[in-house]
Amino acid sequence: MKKNAVFPIVLVLLTVLISELHAQLETRTVKSFEKVIVSPHIQVVFEEGEVEQVSIEDADIPPEKLKVEVNGKTLRIYLEDAKFLTKRVKYKAPYGKNKRPMYQGTEARVVVHYKNLKRLAVRGEQQITLNSPIERQKFRLLLYGESKVVFNKIAVNKLRTTIYGESEVEVKSGTIEKQKYLAYGESRVNTLGAFNGTTRITAYGESDFKVNVRDKIKLSAFGEALVRYEGDPNINRGIVIGRARIKRL
């Protein structure tokens, strides 16, 4: 009786394990790209490699609904019917018909292997992690929504970032000679881990910045922006309307 009871359990465990391995091993080779656009519901880890490809590690949806396309030099990763915004579908509620996001609570995890990455745009609420060092002259970052982007290490001459919404940017280590931020909303930026020459910030809203600056900080703000810094930079206030503050850490 005990053997008969154990066998179904083992069979179920093996089935689950095999299913997970299949999901983790699905890899799609793509054409060469330099720019990436990540749409909602997709958590991405970026790693530099010799082959440009996208590996699906986990997904709450059938793999065919995860779209991977390269147009020109731009790689797009999105869920079906959620290329820009998540499609809303009707459902029956106790008080009548209503609508909700098609992929409510859904998330896919992928790893993007790249050779050259110079521009990244993210839409949604997911976390994006750049595991490999970003080493180049210029890097462009655009965020829409409430996502979080983490750079483990960076070495760039110019970093230009535009944020719409409540997104977060963190740089753990490296060097950024010149960084420029344009922020709309309640964004949060922490680049204390990176040595920086000059920082220029234009903020609309209640953004929070932590920076490590050697030479100069310039702030233009409309709202209640807060800039906290390490280093001994010159402070240049541009147009400031509201309660913008600059403090040494």
Q: Over which residues does each language-model region extend?
A:
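Short, surface-exposed interaction patches in beta-rich subdomains
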Residues: 169-249
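Bacterial Sec-dependent N-terminal signal peptides
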Residues: 1-28
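Short leucine-rich amphipathic alpha-helices used at interfaces
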Residues: 21, 126-127, 197, 204
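Acidic (Asp/Glu) and glycine-rich low-complexity loops/linkers
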Residues: 24-123, 127-142, 153-162, 172-179, ...
